[in-house]
Curated annotation (Swiss-Prot):
GO terms for biological process: cell differentiation; chromosome condensation; spermatogenesis. Belongs to the protamine P1 family. Testis. Residues 1-62 are annotated as: Disordered. Protamines substitute for histones in the chromatin of sperm during the haploid phase of spermatogenesis. They compact sperm DNA into a highly condensed, stable and inactive complex. It is found in: Nucleus; Chromosome. This is Sperm protamine P1. GO terms for molecular function: DNA binding. Keywords: Chromosome, Developmental protein, Differentiation, DNA condensation, DNA-binding, Nucleosome core, Nucleus, Spermatogenesis. Its main location: nucleus. One of its GO terms (cellular component) is nucleus. PROSITE patterns: PROTAMINE_P1.
Length: 62
């Protein structure tokens, strides 16, 4: 079983490498743009949520 598993992963990695390679330049740009937009939105939302939360806790404690 262990031997089979190892060979399977090898293979798999080989297939992945070929594919990456090939569409790395094409999706590179698209991936970067999507990531940047998502990150900025998430950061803003997270900050507001945590703030809030923090201020609420402080009020309750006092």
């Amino acid at each position: 079983m262990a031997r089979y598993r190892h060979s399977r992963s090898r293979x798999r990695s080989r297939y992945r490498r070929r594919r990456r390679x090939r569409s790395r330049y094409r999706s590179x740009r698209r991936r970067y743009r999507g990531r940047r937009r998502r990150r900025s939105r998430r950061g803003r939302r997270r900050r507001g949520y945590s703030r809030x939360r923090y201020s609420r806790r402080r009020r309750r404690r006092y």
